Amino acid sequence: MPATESIARRYAADIGFAVVGELTRKPEWDGVASGPEIGLSCYCRVWVDEGGNAYYVHGKECAIIDPEGMVY
């Protein structure tokens, strides 16, 4: 399992967020994730689960955005 996937899964587990199915890398979505609601302002690698939740990972930090735009 790639390190960024492991970080995304660990963060989701830590906050009680259920990962839906498999996580798939979305390199075309990689980039700077900025905004006060996201809490990250740096280059992130993005993973998406089968439920449409996006996991933005930078270093050991992660933010999850669900299909409705809620940030976790």
Regions found by a protein language model. Give the residues of each.
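Acidic, low-complexity, intrinsically disordered interaction modules
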Residues: V20-Y72
